[in-house]
Amino acid sequence: METFLFTSESVNEGHPDKLCDQVSDAILDACLEQDPESKVACETCTKTNMVMVFGEITTKATVDYEKIVRDTCRGIGFTSADVGLDADNCKVLVNIEQQSPDIAQGVHGHLTKKPEEIGAGDQGHMFGYATDETPELMPLTHVWATKLGAKLTEVRKNKTCPWLRPDGKTQVTVEYKNDNGAMVPIRVHTVLISTQHDETVTNDQIAQDLKEHVIKPVIPSQYLDENTIFHLNPSGRFVIGGPHGDAGLTGRKIIIDTYGGWGAHGGGAFSGKDPTKVDRSGAYIVRQAAKSVVASGLARRCIVQVSYAIGVAEPLSVFVDTYKTGTIPDKDILTLIKENFDFRPGMMSINLDLLRGGNFRYQKTAAYGHFGRDDPDFSWETVKVLKPKA
């Protein structure tokens, strides 16, 4: 049997880049909660003892940026300089301006355009992907890498492993076979976890706890064998972490946010962007389209691309490929997609309820992936049943 290895990585919520994603989306939530028409392009960067938010925001909302930054960092677990950042005493810098009037008139006509007329906030192309290898219709390498990161955070916060600190990374390599275009996982080849820890714990204790409390609950035992390789804190020491260890920036974990290297990516990040930014809304609707194709039994694996021009409502192109796993021709699947999904930015916002912020709606997306999540706030995960015409 011919097989191949494929690897996906993830980082947990204490990684500096992910901290920035969460701050940017917490600010988006605050704006949309009070003013659903808010136009938000919010970036965040961080380094030792400092978090800065900057970008363009036009909103009627009253937003306490500094409080949001501190609350978000505290919620992650950055409560002292020892762990990488002190939420209550770090410097918070804010440099927010209004959206460019040139962009505003071209995209939404200074809020005068009807929803179906609202243009894309920028040019670009986005991809959605789905595969039948997991119940979430997501790649297994990505699902496990992501769940390992989430489990690391869980056992840190519930004090199962009190030596853990917020920063951490995971990576999973799976051996697959190609079944006529569909991906079939056979076994786990390698599990890699690098997690920040305190000064007291030994490397042996780290390895033992990670196997027992993180890997065992996430990866079913039938995928692990005597040849599975475990790299558990292979560098030997990871005490300094978070923004103290590395600078962080919004939008630097776009593969972790999506499909773990499977499918394709148009390059646009998600966090800190309101739904007129098709980098985000376009990627969400093509995930819904690809997932619906697979869930409807039309293919075992599917990728969908959409592209836009700034200020233009209708997409420039829509593309589908089922990797030769389709039960009907790809051109017929494309027709079904175009008939069942409205790719105009204003209509995507309505149909996917993307103008609703608050209650951590967008902040939740900013750690542990935007896709494959079982949460009603992730409206783009809702399947539309697609039926070919008889």
Swiss-Prot record:
Residues reported in the UniProt entry to bind L-methionine: E56, Q99, D246, K277
InterPro entries: ADOMET_SYNTHASE_CS, S-AdoMet_synt_C, S-AdoMet_synt_central, S-AdoMet_synt_N, S-AdoMet_synthetase, S-AdoMet_synthetase_sfam
Chief localization: cytoplasm
Binding locations of Mg(2+): E9
Keyword annotations: ATP-binding, Cobalt, Cytoplasm, Magnesium, Metal-binding, Nucleotide-binding, One-carbon metabolism, Potassium, Transferase
Cofactor: Mn(2+); Mg(2+); Co(2+); K(+)
Residues holding K(+): E43
SUPFAM superfamilies, alphabetized: S-adenosylmethionine synthetase
GO terms classed as biological process: one-carbon metabolic process; S-adenosylmethionine biosynthetic process
EC number: 2.5.1.6
Pathway: Amino-acid biosynthesis; S-adenosyl-L-methionine biosynthesis; S-adenosyl-L-methionine from L-methionine: step 1/1
KW Magnesium (keyword) present: yes
Residues binding ATP: H15, D167, G168, K169, S235, G236, R237, F238, D246, R252, K253, A269, K273, K277
Catalytically driven reaction(s): L-methionine + ATP + H2O = S-adenosyl-L-methionine + phosphate + diphosphate
GO CC, alphabetical: cytosol
Molecular functions (GO terms): ATP binding; metal ion binding; methionine adenosyltransferase activity
Cofactor binding comment, as recorded: Binds 2 divalent ions per subunit. The metal ions interact primarily with the substrate. Can utilize magnesium, manganese or cobalt (in vitro).
Localisation: Cytoplasm
Function: Catalyzes the formation of S-adenosylmethionine from methionine and ATP. The reaction comprises two steps that are both catalyzed by the same enzyme: formation of S-adenosylmethionine (AdoMet) and triphosphate, and subsequent hydrolysis of the triphosphate.
Similarity comment: family membership: Belongs to the AdoMet synthase family.
Family annotation (PANTHER family): S-ADENOSYLMETHIONINE SYNTHETASE
Name the UniProt record assigns to this protein: S-adenosylmethionine synthase 1
Native source organism of the sequence: Nicotiana tabacum
